[in-house]
Structure formats: C-alpha cells, structure tokens
Amino acid sequence: MPQLPSRNPTIGIALIVTAMLVVPFMDAIAKLLSAQYPVLQLVWARFFFHFLVVTPLALWRHSPIGFVTKQPFLQVGRGLFLLAATVCFWAAIKYIPLADAIALLFFDAVIIVALSALVLRERVQTSRWVAAGVGLIGVLMIVRPGFEAFHWASLLALAAAVFFSAFFLSNRVLTGEVVPLVALSYQSVGGFLVMTAIMPFIWVTPTATDLALMLAIGLIGATGHLLLIRAFEHADASLLAPYLYAEIIMQVVLGYWLFNDLPGSWTWLGIALIIIVGIFLSIATKEASRSDNQPIPGAHL
C-alpha cells in the first residue's frame, strides 16, 4: 500500500466541492443526449471511457500486481450495482427534472441505514432510525404519490438509490482489498463488459459532436471519482460530508439553465429534509466506518 500524502483538510474540501460542481455536467449531458440516443448507449459511454481512462492509470501507478485481490468477482459485482444505479438514474432524468432526481438519489443515505441492519446485521441507533423516517417524509414531499405532480420516473430514481446503497455497502465490505485507484478500475469492468455486449442491438451512430459529448460523460465520471479519492486522502469523511450536497445545488442550476426546470415549493422542502438527514447520517456513518478514506453515501458518480 503506497504511503498517503500529507493530509490538508482545506485541499480535501476544495477537491470535493470541485467534484460535486463538475459531476452534474455528466448527468446534464446524459439528459440532453437521451432525446436522440438510447439511455443504455449513454451508460455504455460512461463505463467504456471511464475504463479507458482509469485502468491504464491504475496499471501505471500500481502495476498488475496491484490488481491482485481475494475477491475478484465481488470487486466486479460491485461495479454492477453502480451500473444498475446509473441505468435507473439516467432513465429517470430523461423524464423528470435533474434536481428532483438527484434529491431522491440522496435518499440512499437513509436506505443504507435499513440495509446495514438487515444485511450486515449492524446495530443501528434509534436516532438514525428517526432520521431515516424524516428522510422518508422528504421523499414523499418530492414524489407526492397519488397527486397530480407524481411521475412514475420518480420510482426509477428511488430504484437508483437502492442500487447505490448496495454499491456503498459493498465498498464497506471490500475496504482495504485493493488501493482506491485499482478499486475504481474494477468497478468499471462489469459495466463496460455488460454494456458492450448489448451495444450491437441498440447502437445509434452518433454525430462527431455527440460522440465527443459521450466521451465527456466518461471523462467527467472518471475525473469526479479521482477527485473524490484525493479528497478523502486529505480529510475525514465527517468533515467532507456536508460538501457533497453542493451536487444538488449544481443540478438545480443546470436544470434551470439547460431545461428551464425549477423545483416547486414542496420539492424544495423535501430537498431540505433529505439534505439535513443525509448530512446527519453521513457523519454518523464515520463512527462505524472502518476507514475514513472510503467514499460515503452521497458521492454519486
């Protein structure tokens, strides 16, 4: 394991804010392109170009020996959770505003509370269950089932939150198996292979401009992950957790700028509740985490 650089919390905060301001452009590009291309083709681009960027870098820094792991199938399987989350989320944002979808995605911090108790058999404090209930109220404010504002695609965003929860829990199980950059390479393999197998059946030949945008999707995703890795090397998860929610702000800005979407009053209230609960649960997660250098709920890339 290579020695970590000297820690500088200010640099860590700057890196994570940069990541959270950049990554929403990936989702915005996917939403724009989904009008002309299948969502699955865009997901392929996200994993294919991610793989092309990260894997050579990981091999250069850590050599093939660094890829040795006791659980290679679980490493790749972890990436399949990320694949499923990406498919569901990008299918959702094709139909609903970016801000609504990302707010529902941040509900994964609440889902992790339940899965930690049910799957990992962890003891969950009463305060965290209460916070989970408050977060659920926030979700209901955004989704509003039974009301005219309800859209079925909101359920896809919630499904994405479930898959992201499984992804984060698998990260916890695999903590320390390989260095973060190698883990980042592993998580792209499953998505890259699965989506490449599907491409011959759904491929729509992109224009040169759209191909460049697809490349940008993969580059933004890989860059965001690398920025997060560096951020967690410099600062504790508990310090960085609140800054993850800059992603929601940027999604609102891009949604208004590109699609003329602005959240309504109920959605704003729901977003506020989910942010408050998410920050509380992310900080609480640090106490039970085995490593502060692992991504925490909220880093959706």
What is each residue range found by the language model?
Residues 1-18, 51-77, 126, 176, ...:
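Membrane-interface interhelical linkers
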Residues 105, 121-141, 147, 151-154, ...:
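Loop-to-transmembrane alpha-helix entry segments
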Residues 37-52, 91-109, 150-163, 207-221, ...:
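Structural signature of hydrophobic alpha-helical transmembrane segments
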Residues 41, 48, 91-121, 237-255:
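Specific alpha-helical transmembrane segments that line the substrate/conduction pathway
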Residues 2, 249-301:
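C-terminal-most transmembrane helix of multi-pass membrane proteins
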